[in-house]
Swiss-Prot record:
Compositionally biased tracts (Basic and acidic residues): 376-385
Annotated protein name in UniProt: Acaloleptin A
Protein source organism: Acalolepta luxuriosa
Keyword presence, Lipid metabolism: no
Biased amino acid composition, Polar residues: 34-43, 180-189
Keywords tagged on the record: Antibiotic, Antimicrobial, Cleavage on pair of basic residues, Immunity, Innate immunity, Secreted, Signal
Length: 423
């Protein structure tokens, strides 16, 4: 009976349009105020579908987004097919508020509600009813997050899981007037965290990060301190250094980036006891990108030969630059010359390009790009591949070729060619 009633409700809702959303104001009186500049804080989304296994599934979701409160609920059921079963559902929401209730309490980061709580309850396909609640606070120098979850009914009923963590941001230099770095007052931040998972393991971890103008740093430590998977800790240390290849004063910026080159060394220890070292080198230029990396397990049960990769990208227009070109024998209705002078050369260069209006409206100056790459993997195979792409206004094109040139899986190459036409 309940199933029949639900199907009737779906039929009524779907009259206005299948798989569409209906949004409305709960208050229909003229002049009802907007909430967060949204005219429709409430919305309902009915849906019905049939999958590859022959199951017909119906579901409906209701949402409301308000100034201080959010609400969400949903119901889903396979009404016909081999997987027909009891429905699943969920109900939850979020409430935001200030910890200080005094009038005139200051905003933090332009947020009126630094605190928020989100309770939730749901039933899954296995018949488990799960409840959980999360509390968050986002402040100027500190963030906090805690959560609790438990299967209160069903075959997987067990002890609850939980987590507590946060982030503290600060300057390494505590002197008054210490300069901002990249418009960030706190280049340093530390994030401690502790949690308990479904297997009964209690894990603690801490991460430290610094984001600077030319250097980034990151380090972390994690350990299961209690439970069946208690073991030695894991850790990682790494960073990034950015610099110009040209060290002369006044070297030009590339794509508004002062440091087109960057190197990122890293070392870590995983759960299996392997210590892995790797280093990556990248360059991002106007017409060229370059990427290379090297990685090796230097200690542990999986110690082996290193892996590596080298690749890049070249972007260009289909019509290339022609130095000292003339306009003789050129169809002016289809082609035009664009005078162009290089910064490091007084000789004029004429760029040949299509004179179509859409050429000037293209967001990218180089719709074509070529990506060669070669790499060696953990299995000892050295693979070479090359890809070519073009992104146009109405047409996209892509082609690629790949081959294992050395190693146990050496074989004939693979390739692909495809595209997209929009109209």
């Amino acid at each position: 009976m309940i199933t029949k009633i639900s199907l009737i409700l779906f039929a009524v809702l779907l009259v206005s349009g299948l798989e569409e959303e209906e949004r409305w104001k709960r208050s229909l009186q003229p002049g009802a105020p907007n909430v967060n500049n949204n005219d429709q804080p409430w919305q309902v989304s009915p849906h019905i579908s049939r999958d590859d296994s022959g199951n017909t599934k119906t579901d409906i979701n209701v949402q409301r987004h308000g100034e201080n409160n959010d609400f969400e609920a949903g119901w889903s059921k396979v009404v016909r097919g081999p997987n027909k079963a009891k429905p699943t559902w969920h109900i939850g929401g979020t409430h935001r508020w200030r910890r200080s209730l005094q009038p005139g309490a200051p905003n933090i980061n332009n947020k009126d509600q630094p605190w928020q709580v989100s309770p939730h309850i749901s039933r899954d396909d296995n018949g488990n009813t799960r409840t959980n609640i999360n509390v968050q606070r986002h402040g100027e120098n500190n963030d906090f997050e805690a959560g609790w979850s438990k299967v209160v009914r069903g075959p997987n009923k067990a002890k609850p899981t939980w987590h507590i963590g946060g982030t503290h941001r600060w300057r390494r230099s505590l002197q008054p007037g210490a300069p901002n770095v990249n418009n960030k007052d706190q280049p340093w931040q530390v994030s401690p965290h502790i949690s308990r998972d479904d297997s009964g393991n209690t894990r603690t971890n801490i991460n430290v990060q610094r984001h600077g103008e030319n250097n980034d740093f990151e380090a972390g430590w994690s350990k299961v301190v209690r439970g069946p998977n208690k073991a030695k800790p894991t850790w990682h240390i790494g960073g990034t250094h950015r610099w110009r290849r040209s060290l002369q004063p006044g070297a030009p910026n590339v794509n508004n980036k002062d440091q087109p080159w960057q190197v990122s060394p890293h070392i870590s220890r995983d759960d299996s006891g392997n210590t892995n070292t790797d280093i990556n080198l990248q360059r991002h230029g106007e017409n060229h990108d370059f990427d290379a990396g090297w990685s090796k397990v230097v200690r542990g049960p999986n110690k082996a030969k290193p892996t590596w990769h080298v690749g890049g990208t070249y972007r260009w227009r289909r019509s290339v630059d022609i130095p000292h070109a003339s306009t003789d024998n050129v169809d002016e209705t289809f082609w035009e010359f664009d005078p162009h002078t290089e910064d490091d050369d007084d000789k004029p260069v004429l760029r040949l390009r299509r004179s179509d209006d859409e050429d000037e409206e293209e967001e990218e100056d180089q719709p074509w790009q070529l990506n060669p790459n070669i790499a060696r993997g953990d299995d000892g195979n050295t693979r070479a591949d090359v890809n070519i792409k073009r992104r146009g206004e109405n047409h996209d094109f892509e082609a690629g070729w790949s081959k294992v040139v050395d190693g146990p899986d050496r074989a004939k190459p693979t390739w692909h060619v495809g595209g997209t036409f929009r109209w």
